[in-house]
Swiss-Prot record:
This is Methionine synthase. InterPro entries: Cbl-bd_cap (IPR003759), Cobalamin-bd (IPR006158), Cobalamin-bd_sf (IPR036724), Dihydropteroate_synth-like_sf (IPR011005), HCY_dom (IPR003726), HCY_dom_sf (IPR036589), Met_Synthase/Corrinoid (IPR050554), Met_synthase_B12-bd (IPR033706). L-homocysteine is bound via the zinc atom. Pathway: Amino-acid biosynthesis; L-methionine biosynthesis via de novo pathway; L-methionine from L-homocysteine (MetH route): step 1/1. Its EC number is 2.1.1.13.
Length: 1226
């Protein structure tokens, strides 16, 4: 059974694009069914609500499901999907109906079968097929549902296999022609599903065609569990599906690039059934049948498709339109792809004949790393993860994980560590090699990895039967396999035996098991040389020759080995061991070795091994001399403490001999200021006038910089350094230019300003530098600039464009005000909008409609150049504005139809669903040191260990997590330079006292009263000194609470004596003066750098002070012992939310904090009219101690909460609307 269906389907797929049906849920919604409809007669007295259990309708409303199936077949569908998306026992448990899973699956398949047969009977030349649907369930096997325990799972691989097996049997029994595993958001779930399906096929003695369809969740191009499209494909390729595709989450416009990628890499047929666009404000889908068909037609004509249908929001009308659009279009031809081993973690790793040597990291192995073994034994898993992370950062493309140690529960340790690895993208991006001598440990590991990994290892030592059984399971789990050269006789130690065993194993795997040859990796045994035993002298050479033999005789098989074994005789002399590894790998790779288990951080380069030592090592490795071991031992001691030196680059200053124009270009590209004045003067002497130096070689050099930046070959910090060189050259030339009364031409004059009330300008400064690098003249008015000054200077300086920047949410209203004033005053200039709090939606809806001239949202520095060029070009401007208007019109239209992703609830309902904390059995901790604590001019050396460097790199548009970014393939070198410069500047600042950091905190008696928090003047708690006003989440939370910060303080009526903390810190005292001084010197790089490091110091101060409060001042976590990485990940008790941020988004509450602490008088920090903090590098907020306190986002609130908040604050409604605008619907 199934073979005929597959042949029939494949025949049709070669001739035309087949149609899958459309959305089932969408059609069910159109019936507007009520609770009683879902219950039917059978479930009238069921003990929980059943509305929404669409799959149950196959039992209670079968006629509706049949109508929907029939409508899709009438529209042209070839394949019906059964109504079983949520019919597994796991998903049905939500309705306590897990016992009905098999019945529902059977009934659903039977219904679809009946309808399909009816339509096939009408036209036997066009058979209709039933795809038994296996959905993703509501659990994830590779993601923890508990943010506090990334190693926890609420479902197991085995549990999923059991659930999917039950569903599969019923779907087959009901008459399914094929199995569709769809809407895969966690690949490990899908692997469990595929495992179940294959097991059931074997059990029933059948093999139906299998379709696989995954879900790319957003613009990141990844599944919910983090895999890229190709990594996802590699992980499930072993299923050998008839088709591989994508569905749901995205509309055709967004999904196109991923379907195109899949069409390039998939050896099987490609399917797609996208949504009808993205959901609007009402959760509905707006893409019409005609619009969707237009997209699909283009896909088909581009050769992406073999099967196509629709998902959420699609109807029979959509399918009919799509059927018409693809009719007669030639289906995608199956590509002829080269044979490769396709592995994956979160990202793909394809290994083929052209691939360079693959490094397998060896340090996550308890048998080979004393440090790793100690950490696992002590259950120091966070530090053990660091070992894995270091391996990847040092170049390991696969990590080998082994837990075989007598005192460990190897299976439990393997599962725990792999689950934790899955939560670390820097580690889980690479494939895993599950390494154990115990088969049960290997299986346990395979059940934890969502990518395609490698089993290390199986062999013939226990006979052919067990070898085959294990190989079949490896195949079913979807892994590649290492096969040891070991049979019933023993390990292969000669060239001949290595080939003999590998040949036998290869033919068993390929010919009898059906194992893909490209997924077979032989380990022909690397043994130690230079042992003093003559029989061992040929071990290395035999391995090298066996590599060549195996590659020649066994097509597509790969070769690996534990490289460190070869140097075992030289334990204790790491330098010589590294030299042996380098030489051995050099010859192995030449003969065809594909990968090796190595310490990725200690690989030496063959050519860097000193010649004398290299020759001695080669004598041993290649067994060229009978006295090779003795000679190597003699010279080994001389190298015991050495490390490979690197010769000085003698050509470092070779560029100084180049022509001056090339020297200037080199200096600009490399950011070298050392010779710039000297070279600029030389260029001036050669020019007829000084302006020619700017317009000639200097601008030529900056054009090269601009090109490299645009191509991604230079990064923002380098561009800023280039600008520094340019400014110094121009500053030198200015007196000569002025003396000649000459004027320079520019691409345009742009005024930039951070709006009134806002003090943040790092982003604006970077935009200014990038624009200057592209020959725009910049007038920077700085921060907190009132509207009147902006417009006055714009008129006086006759600027071409005005650019506004802001970070805090009140700045959005100020930008609207500036736009209105520009309209009122008759300006015609383009207006640019940028900054962290701005968005295209806000620009289109709130700003652009108040000003008739172009208003352009600029989301990053690199885009600014193109925008300004287009706006000031007579040729480009009309088309640019037309596209901009259309884009904004679409944005406004989408916004007008937008509703919250979750249904809003009343304030009364939200309060009724507050966080249910057990105050009766909880005693709030009393402070160890109550009162106010001031930290004036704290040593920067104290704060530097608390710095989180990741946001620092983001400031410079270098995306990646510290410290991994320092080794990033593309930006690593620049990140290292930037990191070095930042620390050098911090050293200077610390040494010379150029920046000061001050802060303060205090703890106050407090109690919650409804949504607000009363703060008392003393411990008698009789007098309310302050009230902290809070907002509550106001959308439906079926599985959680509607949080408000007051939930974390003991209610007044509880009688519990609780406390709240307040703090304010700054790392920026002196930062503005320093930045201005650097700017005056033409050094934009250090001007931006000082702002960036001041910001980091402020955040570090906040982290440091919170730790001090937890451990000493409040003292509720006196035993806490966390690393800086733990602090960054917030692995501590308590929270420190800041006014103006998601949990307490209303900025004016800072004024209360300032009063409580007397901040301005004590440490000099102040608030602007928009409640931005000055200095800008500052942090303030509240301290909560409750162990269940957590961060959350208030998000959108409703009118009833707006009125309540205004009333409690004593505000007019208009005032409340102004400060809460970001949390209100437009």
């Amino acid at each position: 059974m199934g073979k005929e269906v597959r042949q029939q389907l494949e025949q049709q797929l070669k001739q035309r694009i087949l149609l899958i049906d459309g959305g089932m849920g969408t059609m069910i919604q159109s019936y507007k069914l009520q609770e009683e409809d879902y219950r039917g007669a059978r479930f009238v007295d069921w003990h929980c609500d059943l509305k929404g259990n669409n799959d149950l309708l196959v039992l209670t409303q079968p006629q509706i499901i049949k109508e929907i199936h029939s409508a899709y077949l009438e529209a042209g569908a070839d394949i019906l999907e059964t109504n079983t998306f949520n019919s597994t026992t796991i998903a049905m448990a939500d309705y306590d109906m897990q016992s009905l899973s098999a019945e529902i699956n059977f009934a659903a398949a039977k219904l679809a079968r009946e309808v399909a047969d009816e339509w096939t009977a009408k036209d036997p030349s066009r058979p209709r097929y039933v795809a038994g649907v296996l959905g993703p369930t509501n659990r994830t096997c590779s993601i923890s549902p508990d943010v506090n325990d990334p190693g926890f799972r609420n479902v197991t691989f085995d549990g999923l296999v059991e659930a999917y097996s039950e569903s599969t049997r019923a779907l087959i029994k009901g008459g399914s022609d094929l199995i569709l595993i769809e809407t895969i958001f966690d690949t490990l779930n899908a692997k469990a599903c595929a495992f179940a399906v294959d097991s059931v096929f074997e059990e029933l003695g059948i093999s139906l065609p299998v379709m696989i369809s995954g879900t790319i969740t957003d613009a990141s191009g990844r599944t919910l569990s983090g895999q890229t499209t190709e990594a996802f494909y590699n992980a499930l390729r072993h299923v050998r599906p008839i088709s591989f595709g994508l569905n749901c989450a995205l509309g055709p416009d967004e999904l196109r690039q991923y379907v195109e990628e899949l069409s390039r890499i998939s050896e099987c047929y490609v399917s797609a059934h996208p949504n009808a666009g993205l959901p609007n404000a009402f959760g509905e889908y707006d893409l019409s049948a005609e619009e969707m068909a237009e997209h699909i037609a283009e896909w088909a004509q581009a050769g992406f498709l073999n099967l196509v249908g629709g998902c959420c929001g699609t109807t029979p009308e959509h399918i009919a339109a799509i059927a018409k659009a693809v009719e007669g279009v030639k289906p995608r031809a199956l590509p002829d792809l080269k044979v490769e081993c396709r592995l994956s973690g979160l990202e793909p790793l394809n290994i083929g004949p052209e691939t360079l040597f693959v490094n397998v990291g060896e340090r996550t192995n308890v048998t080979g790393s004393a440090r790793f073994k100690r950490l696992i034994k002590e259950e120091q898993y966070d530090e053990a993860l660091d070992v894995a992370r270091e391996q990847v950062e040092n170049g390991a493309q696969i990590i080998d994980i082994n837990m075989d140690e007598g005192m460990l529960d190897a299976e439990a340790c393997m599962v725990r560590f792999l689950n934790l690895c899955a939560s670390e993208p820097e580690i889980s991006k690479v494939p895993v090699m599950v390494d154990s001598s115990k088969w049960e440990v290997i299986e346990a590991g395979l059940k934890c990895i969502q990518g395609k990994g490698i089993v290390n290892s199986i062999s013939l030592k226990e006979g052919k039967e067990k070898f085959i059984a294990q190989a079949k399971l490896v195949r079913r789990y979807g892994a590649a396999v290492i096969v040891m050269a070991f049979d019933e006789v023993g390990q292969a130690d000669t060239r001949e035996r290595k080939l003999e065993i590998c040949r036998r194993a290869y033919h068993i795997l390929v010919d009898e098991v059906g194992f893909p040859p490209e997924d077979i990796i032989f380990d022909p045994n690397i043994f130690a040389v230079a042992t003093g035993i003559d029989e061992h002298n040929n071990y290395a050479l035999d391995f090298i020759n066996a590599v060549a033999d195996i590659k020649r005789e066994l097509p597509h098989a790969m070769i690996s080995g534990g490289v460190s074994n070869v140097s075992f005789s030289f334990r204790g002399n790491n330098y010589v061991r590294e030299a042996i590894h380098a030489v051995f790998l050099y010859h192995c790779f030449k003969h065809g070795m594909d990968m090796g288990i190595v310490n990725a951080g200690q690989l030496e380069i063959y050519d860097n091994v000193p010649l004398k030592l290299r020759e001695a090592v080669e004598d041993v490795i290649l067994n060229r001399r009978s006295d090779g071991t003795e000679r190597l031992l003699e010279i080994a001691e001389a190298y015991r403490e050495n490390s490979v030196g690197k010769e000085e680059d003698a050509s470092a200053l070779e560029w100084r001999a180049w022509p001056v124009a090339k020297r200037l270009e080199h200096a600009l590209v490399k950011g070298i200021t050392e010779f710039i004045v000297q070279d600029t003067e030389e260029a001036r002497q050669q020019a007829s006038k000084p302006l020619e130096v700017i317009e000639g070689p200097l601008m030529d050099g900056m054009n090269v910089v601009g090109d490299l930046f645009g191509e991604g070959k230079m990064f923002l910090p380098q561009v800023v350094k280039s600008a520094r060189v340019m400014k110094q050259a121009v500053a030198y030339l200015e007196p000569f230019i002025n003396a000649q009364k000459s004027g320079s031409t520019s691409n345009g004059k742009i005024l930039l300003a951070t709006v009134k009330g806002d003090v943040h300008d790092i982003g604006k400064n970077i935009v200014g530098v990038v624009l200057q690098c592209n020959n725009f003249e910049i007038i920077d008015l700085g921060v907190m600039v009132p509207c009147e000054q902006i417009l006055k200077v714009a008129r006086e300086q006759n600027v071409d464009i005005i650019g506004l920047s802001g970070l805090i949410t009140p700045s959005l209203d100020e930008m609207v005000h500036v736009a209105k004033e520009m309209e009122r005053q008759g300006f015609e200039l383009p207006l640019l909008i940028g900054g962290a709090t701005t968005s295209k939606a806000h620009t289109a809806v709130k700003i652009e409609q108040n000003y008739h001239a172009p208003v352009v949202y600029v989301n990053n520095a690199s885009r600014a150049v193109g925008v300004c060029t287009s706006l000031l070009s007579d040729e480009q401007r009309p088309g640019f504005i037309e596209r901009l208007d259309l884009d904004y019109e679409r944005t406004r239209d989408q916004h007008a139809r937008k509703t919250p992703k979750s249904r809003p609830v009343t304030l009364e309902q939200a309060r009724a669903n507050k966080a249910a904390l057990d105050w009766a059995n909880y005693t709030p901790p009393a402070p160890a040191k109550p009162g106010v604590h001031v930290f004036e001019n704290i040593a920067l050396a104290t704060l530097r260990p608390y710095i989180d460097w990741t946001p620092f790199f983001m400031t410079w548009s270098l995306m990646g997590k510290y410290p991994a970014i320092l080794e990033h393939e593309e930006v690593g070198e620049e990140a290292k330079r930037l990191f070095h410069d930042a620390n050098a500047l911090l050293d200077k600042v610390e040494r010379e006292g150029l920046l000061k950091a001050s802060g303060m905190c205090a703890l106050f008696p407090a109690a919650s009263v409804g949504d607000d928090i009363e703060v008392y003047s003393d411990e008698s708690r009789t007098q309310v000194a302050h009230v902290l006003y809070n907002l509550r989440q106001q959308t439906e939370k079926p599985k959680g609470a509607n949080y408000c910060l007051s939930d974390y303080v003991a209610p007044k009526e509880s009688g519990k004596r609780d406390w709240i903390g307040a703090f304010a810190v700054t790392g920026g005292i002196g930062e503005r003066a320093l930045a201005d001084a650097y700017k005056a010197q033409g050094d934009d790089y250090n001007a931006i750098m000082i702002q960036a490091v001041a910001d980091r110091l402020a955040e570090a101060f906040a982290e440091y002070l919170h730790e001090k409060v937890r451990k000493e001042i409040w003292g509720y976590a006196s035993d806490e012992n966390l690393s800086n990485d733990d602090l960054i990940r917030e692995r501590y008790q308590g929270i420190r939310p800041a006014p103006g941020y998601p949990a307490c988004p209303e900025h004016t509450e800072k004024a209360t904090l300032w009063q409580m602490l007397n901040v301005e008088e004590t440490i000099g920090m102040s608030l602007t009219t928009s409640y931005a903090m000055w200095p800008g590098a500052s942090v303030s907020g509240w301290y909560f101690s409750h162990p269940d306190s957590r961060y959350f986002a208030v998000a959108q609130i409703q009118p009833d909460q707006l009125h309540s908040y205004a009333e409690r604050k004593g505000w007019r409604l208009e005032e409340a609307e102004k400060w809460l605008a970001p949390n209100l619907d437009a």
